[in-house]
Amino acid sequence: MKQTKVLILGAGGAIAHHVIQFLQHHGNIHLTLFLRNKSHLKGIKGPNINIVEGDVLHHKQLNEAMKDQDIVYANLAGSLDKMARQIVEAMEKNGVRRLIFVTSLGIYNEVPGAFGKWNDSMIGNSLAPYREAADIIETSDLDYTVVRPAWLTDNEEVDYELTQKGEDFKGTEVSRKSVAAYIADLIQHPRKNIKASVGIDKPGTEGDKPSFY
């Protein structure tokens, strides 16, 4: 059976950690875990796992990690626009087509009502690079899914609903484990939600702001 080779960029993050847990025992999936500091992945090992230290903004390191991959899943923080540009370029250079890229709710002003106003007051000033990253990806020729999570919780649950670009965002919050479950599902079914920008939230969490505020 041919293994699907998956490159996880930002593999030390909390959502990525759940994705790794969902996928690490699937014999048909090989994970390359790319992150700045290997110590963030203590205890993660296996025959289908390769850990690489590197920086997404370091062209040569990213290019090396990208070779022979089938799917790239990026869950990053910081200069997301610059990172998106580097990732798209490296994928095109290496003939890798499938990209799953996590951004944020609010990048299209898609969050309605009082929650939309609250969200904008909290994170509106920092959303520009997230929107630019989505624009870079959406204008590429890649088979992308942009993922826009609601406010994140550490609840041990998988319970989510999706909205598409152009639709109003629904709930206020979602668990990191739920976002990871959706991403793991995309990795296992890579033809799903291609050329899509998907909002993800927990059903029934509509309101003026997340419950933990």
Which positions does each model-derived feature cover?
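NAD(P)H-binding glycine-rich loop region in Rossmannoid oxidoreductase-like domains
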Residues: 6-7, 33-93
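Glycine-/Pro-rich loop/turn segments that contact NAD(P) or position catalytic residues
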Residues: 79-163
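Short beta-strand "acidic-cap" motif of Rossmann-like dinucleotide-binding folds
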Residues: 31-33, 147
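A generic structural motif
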Residues: 27-31, 193
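Active-site-lining helix/loop region of Rossmann-like oxidoreductase modules
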Residues: 9-14, 127-128, 136, 155-156, ...
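N-terminal Rossmann NAD(P)H-binding glycine-rich loop of SDR-like oxidoreductase domains
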Residues: 4-26
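Residues in the short beta-alpha loop(s) of Rossmann-like NAD(P)-binding domains
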Residues: 12, 37, 105
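Nucleotide donor/acceptor-binding cores
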Residues: 2-4, 29, 97
